[in-house]
Amino acid sequence: MADQITSATASAMSVRMPARKVRMVIDLIRGKSVAEAIAILEFTPRAASPVVIKVLKSAIANAEHNYDLDAENLVVTKAYANEGPTLKRFRPRAKGSASPINKRTSHITVVVSEKEA
């Protein structure tokens, strides 16, 4: 079949973590096999690692369940983090003034597909 789907996607929206910090973790797994990517993420001491592992495992499950792809042949083809909505807060400061605090969020997307033989 020529139009057979060979990739699966998973995403996490509005994760309470800046996209800049998530990108540092995502850059480590792009282009790797899914087993290697999970091994890398489990030993990466960053707050974004557990979230990215969760999205990656979701993409693997989507590939197996929805498209009948073999998990051992999957590769992380695309992985990116875009900025989500920013939560704007204010911190009281001296003399009745206030400073803004931007609590940034991100949208994380991981695409896995089968290796070309």
From Swiss-Prot:
Keyword terms, alphabetized: Ribonucleoprotein, Ribosomal protein, RNA-binding, rRNA-binding
GO molecular function (one): structural constituent of ribosome
Superkingdom classification of source: Bacteria
SUPFAM superfamilies: Ribosomal protein L22 (SSF54843)
Coiled-coil residues: none
NCBIfam families, per the entry: rplV_bact
PANTHER family noted in UniProt: CHLOROPLAST 50S RIBOSOMAL PROTEIN L22-RELATED, LARGE RIBOSOMAL SUBUNIT PROTEIN UL22M
Function statement: This protein binds specifically to 23S rRNA; its binding is stimulated by other ribosomal proteins, e.g. L4, L17, and L20. It is important during the early stages of 50S assembly. It makes multiple contacts with different domains of the 23S rRNA in the assembled 50S subunit and ribosome.
Name of the protein this chain belongs to: Large ribosomal subunit protein uL22
Organism: Latilactobacillus sakei subsp. sakei (strain 23K) (Lactobacillus sakei subsp. sakei)
